[in-house]
Structures are given as structure tokens and as C-alpha cells.
Amino acid sequence: MATQNDIPNSTPEDLAKQVEIAEKHPDPPAMPSRLPDSLKTLEAKIDTSKITDEEVANVHRFQRACDYLAASLIFLSNGLYTGGDLEEKDIKTRLLGHWGTCPGLSIVYSHCNRIINKYDLNMLFVVGPGHGAPAILSALFLEDSLGPFYPRYQFTKEGLNNLINTFSLPGGFPSHVNAEVPGAIHEGGELGYALSVSYGAVLDRPDLIVTCVVGDGEAETGPTATSWHAHKFLDPAESGAVIPVLELNGYKISERTIYGCMDDSELLSLFSGFGYEVAIVNDTPDQNRVMAATMDWAVERIHDIQHRARVNREEIKPRWPMIILRTPKGKGCPKYLNGKFLEGTFRAHQVPLKLARTDTNQRNLLKDWLNSYNCQDFLDEHGLPTKGITEHLPPREKRMGQRHETYNSYLPLKVPDWKKYGVKKGETTSATSVVGQYLDELLVTNDSTLRIFSPDELESNKLDGALKHSYRTMQTDPELMAKRGRVTEVLSEHLCQGFMQGYTLTGRTAIFPSYEAFMTIVVSMLVQYSKFLKMGLETGWHGKFGSLNYVTSSTWARQEHNGFSHQSPRFITTMLSLKPGVSRVYFPPDANCFLATVARCMKSENTINLMVSSKNPQPAYLSVEEAEHHCKAGASVWKFASTDNGENPDVVIAGVGNEIMFEVVKAAEMLQNDIPELRVRVINVTDLMVLSSLHPHGMNPAEFDSLFTKDRHVHFNYHGYVMDLKALLFDRIQGTRVTMEGYREEGTTTTPFNMMMCNNTSRYHVARMALQHALHNPTVAVNCNMLCAKYAWKLEEIENYIMENKDDPPEIYAAPVFKNKTSTL
């Protein structure tokens, strides 16, 4: 136990010394904490005695070459610089890119190549600081991983010059890692997601290791903060492993990082508490020797943990290895510029010499910088790597830029027949409960290619049938450890999304169920993923992607008990804003349609699917066969609820959404009883995108007109925001003959039917709109005013009942009944 004597006291003299150091050093060490010195015993003990001088020289040579090319990508416009004066024309007119993180990335990449060779590893490289693309592209060129995908970047002088001259310019690679970069499974622009994506990638891939570099700026983000716990959902018996490397260079764009201001005791206690065994590699003259030994240690610790779980069948709570790598920000660039520190400060974050094209002094500094790498030691006269680099690269199929898992590993699911789970037409049941049983079989049938990730909401959304033959995956829970679970529940939507992305981008398929209102937490991650998906599909060399599958339940319509904060369909808006080619939005109206939709989504490729359904009991409007036909069409006339099967209607009422459609059907029932002379066509839209003229699922004009007529008024009762529906229908239907209601941002803690009333989506609102737009029918014209008044009074009566009884009238949820109806779809 630590004593008071173990805790250092900061005297005024100590503080003054720290200030003096800070003034003389570009990146002063962190001020000492008041933690016990004994915490430093938590640091892993690394043996460097087995690392040879040749190994150190090899990785250092690769780093120099990588840094030299990275700087060239940022600055040069006329190919590789091999000596002599630099002229203005040799410098790009626009200097773009980020140098600060590049040296750290080249260090880690070079050491990954070394351990791939030494241990015959299957390894991926995930880059959190994706703005370090110059280093990654340089490493990929040096290992000849660009040429196989891009002929213009072949392993030749011309290919290298093309890479340099076009970087971050039209026609070249962007300044951040993205789907166009071979080996990438992570969009590198927005920070925070690298670690969770890495852990998702190794699930169900027992022979895969991902080295994930997390920048110390990125480590400040919320998603990264929770991702440090991701290893706790990793079963070492069935999955691979991640080596997290915290690249601690001390600075963000313009100030110090939180982690850069933490001393060793603080870092060791923090990450040890997260469950890691931590090794710190400092910026010393012997850094490469220590880093080599540390990477060896990390791999051997991983293999030991996996052996104990797989061979010895031990149920263990492992401490996975983690590395903290300290490097000066922008290591290698000029130390000073205009009397201020450059190397080792935030000034080296992006382009250290911003005026290199027009300022002679800065151009000379750049020349000295490039010459400092002594490129003649590792590049030939054509700028290509010489002996000393090429022979130490991994075999081609093992190179991190050519791993098939990153671009050509999609494994289609085996999708069982959903019909055996279908419910009898007219039966009232929870659609999610039925689908939960189907998910169970899907997980059993695809026991290494399908997973569910949920923020502790599976049971709440009545999908717990998925757990019949599976378990949850938390390995630190003694009741769940080593159970080979397929369902990960962690109360972090960001972590669920990251897991799903990593799992999907390495060839598998995932499902993400959540409350409708809280799915918006991952909106930014979804948008970034959609960009990755779009660019990946446009490369021409990327294979198929598995689908991302979102299931939102506990919708606004039935979150009356939790209140306004739980009522939001905004995630739908985001889905509709994505590129039409990748986005799918489904509103299955009953259990059978939900089953058919899940089966369809499980077979889909290259898409992002959203399924919106209710967990509360609803009638099954359609038989199994009818549901199958309806879902294939995406929208259809519900003849059983329409007048004369929907022929020659006076008005069309359409529903989009589960609870919403119930109100449409009840409105049709009510109108049939109150004014049978009104000819109503009832339509359900289950695939929202069929309404769009721009979407691959969109109906052609003839199909649209046949369904919604050419001249009759159409009223939509819509689950989401009306503005979204208006955008879909903008060029489809004349504005004067369409009305629509949807969620109006009205809600509170109330009753389910009151939610419908306050958002104008109740059966009475639908019926009034139908009457008011069918006045060409003489009978309707005569009776419209009376019936509309009746429905208005009924709404007031129900509102009074709710306020008095704190519940909806019991008859509200009676299943609809239509007279003399035998027609089917």
C-alpha cells in the first residue's frame, strides 16, 4: 500500500523548474501528478536484449523513406526531389496535408511489417489520425500496394511522380485516408471511431490482428473514450485481437492534448484500469529498439491469451497489451521557424512551411529538411526503394495494403425461410417478438458471419427471442465469459456502430436495434460510413459490402410513457439524405411484413437499411403470401380496407408506418360505416423509397399513377417528418392534390392515442381529410360538414376521457372489421 511518502509534493521550486523547461523545450514533459510512484510498477517490463542492430536499421530505413516521401507528397509538384536547388515551380501552388502525425505513423507501420514477417501474422492497419494520409500512401507505395489497384501508381519512377504530383489535388488521393486507399477500413476524416472499428473487424476472425493507431487528440473524443472498453467484448477463443497504439505527440491543431499533459503514473493507472497491460515507448535515441521489443511483447502476449482460451479452455479475464508511443509532433521537420519552435509543437500539425513556394528562406529550409533523410541510402536514381527495404517487406499477400479482408471478403448470409414464423392473418401480436424468433435462427445459421449490436435495448424492444440459442458477449461478466455469444449489448451507441462498421467492412453482416429517438446519436458516424461506402463502390476494385441494418422500435408513437425526449423520427431524415444508391428505408406494417423485410435486408449488399417497426401488439393485416407480394412491390392497394377493392376511388388515403397505418385502416373502417357512398382507396407504403423518382427502388411514372391515380386527392399519414415526404414526392404529384400529416414535434408524457391526436395523425384527422377532398361526390358534399363536426367532437370527447381516466378509451385498439370483405391483395 502506498504511503504518504510515496506521493510527491510540488514545491514552488518544482513549479518554477517546470516553467523554465517549458520555455526552453518545444514539448515539455507533463507536470508531475500527485499519484504514488508505486503506480509505475504497472508498466510492462520490456526486454530489448534480443533485438539486433540489423532489425533496428531495417525499420529505421523504412521510416526515413516513408517520411521522405510523405514530405514530398505535401510539398512537391515536379516529382521526387533528389538533390540540387528547389525552385518555386517545384513546389505545389496549394500546400495541403498534415505532417504532424506522419512520423509517428511511419514508425508504427514499419514495426508492423517487421512483426508480420517474424510471426507470420495476418494484420490490418487502422489509422485514427487519418489526416496522416501522406505517411500511409508513402508506406503503401514502398511496399508496392498501390500499383495493383491503380495502374497510374505502379512501382516505377512514373508511378511515384504521379503519386507526388497529384496528392491532395484533383485526380489524386485526398489528404485523408478514405475508401480509395488500399487496406483502409476506416474513413479517416472524423475522429473517434478507429478503435471500435478495429475491434469489430477482428470479431469471428481468430487469426487476425489489427494494429490501431489512436491519436492523442482523437483520444479526447467521447466515442474513443468508451472504445477503450471494447476488448471486454472480445472472446479470445473465437476472435482475433487489437494492438492499440496511442500516438502521443502532445498537440492538437493549436494546443496541448489532455493525454499529453498526463505523466506516466496517470497514464498507467488510467489504461490499467481499462484492463490493459501498458507499455510506454518514449522518444529516445534507442526508440526503435524499444519499439521492436514492445511489438514482440504485444504479439506474444496476444498469442498467450489466445492459447490459454483456445487450447487450455481457461476462462480468463485477460489484460490485453497496449502501447503508448511518444513522438515529437512533426518529428524531422525544421526545429525553428521565424524564431519559434516548429518541430514538437502544434505548428507542425499541418504544413510546417506554408510559404515554401514563395519564400526563399522557407524553400531552403525545405531543401535541408528533405536532404536530412539522405535518400540516396534507400532510393535508387529512379526514386524506388533499394535493397535494405524491399527484402524486408512481408510477402505480397501479407502486406497490409493488400489484405483481402479489407476489400474482397464479403460472405453472403444463409437466409432461412421466414414464412414458418409467420402469424395468422388477423392475429394481434408484437411484430418485434415474432422477428426476434427469426433472428435467433439467423444467428444459429450464420454463427460466424452475423452479429447483433445493441445499446442494452434488445429485451426492451421485445427482440429477446434472438437470445434463445445465443448469449451476450461481455467477457468480464463471469456468467457470460466464454459462451460464444452473438449479441453484444453495451450502452454506447457509438461503440455499437463502430463494432458494426468494422464487422461489415471486413465481409460480414450486422444488425443494430435501438430506440428510434436515440439512434440519432450515431448520425455523424452513419454519414461518414456512407461516404466510405460510396467511394468504395466507385473504386472499381472493391468487392461487395455487407449491409448495415438498423432496426428502430419504441417509436415516438408509443413513447408516450417516457415523454418528449424519447419522441423523434429524425434518423429517418438522415437516411433519406444519403446517396439514393445506398439508402433503404422500410416501414413494415405488421409482423409478416416485418419478417419479409428482415429476410430481404439480410440478403442485401452494398446498402444501408433502416427498418422501423412497433414492439406493441398490432393486428396482422396480411397473410404470409400477401405480405410477401406486398413487400416485393413496396407499396400496394389494401383491397380489404378499400371500397370495391379500391377501384374508381373518390379519394386515396395512404399510410407509411406501423402505428400510423393502424389509424389509416381504422379511418377507412369508420368511413365505410358512416358514409359508404364515399369510395376510398387505401394504400400502404412499406418501402419508402418506391415514392422517389431518383431511387433504384422508385416506381416509374406509370406505376405511380396506377397506384395513386392521376387526378384524385391523396392524403398521406406518415410516420416521420412531413418535409421528408414532401421532398420524395416533389416531382411526383401536383401539390394541390396531396396533403400529408406526420410527426409535428408534439408530444409529452401522455397516452398513445393522444400522441396521434396532437400530431394530427389519428383516424379522425385522416377521415376528415378524406371527406374534405372528395367533395366532387355529391353525397360527400352534402354530409361532409356534419361528419367533420362529428369527428371534431369525438376528438374533444376522447381528450376529456384521457384527462379524466389517464388512459385511452378501450375501444380505440379494437381490430378493424370490414363488411363483406373477401378480397386479398
From Swiss-Prot:
Is NADP among the key words of this record?
Answer: no
Q: What's an example GO BP annotation here?
A: carbohydrate metabolic process
Q: Which UniProt keywords apply?
A: Lyase, Thiamine pyrophosphate
Broad EC category: lyase
The prosthetic group or cofactor this protein requires is: thiamine diphosphate
Gene3D superfamilies, alphabetically?
3.40.50.920, 3.40.50.970
One GO term describing the cellular component: nucleus
Record GO terms (molecular function): aldehyde-lyase activity
PANTHER family attached here? PHOSPHOKETOLASE-RELATED (PTHR31273:SF1)
Q: Which family does it belong to?
A: Belongs to the XFP family.
Designated name of the protein: Probable phosphoketolase
Species name: Schizosaccharomyces pombe (strain 972 / ATCC 24843) (Fission yeast)
Provide the taxonomic classification.
Eukaryota, Fungi, Dikarya, Ascomycota, Taphrinomycotina
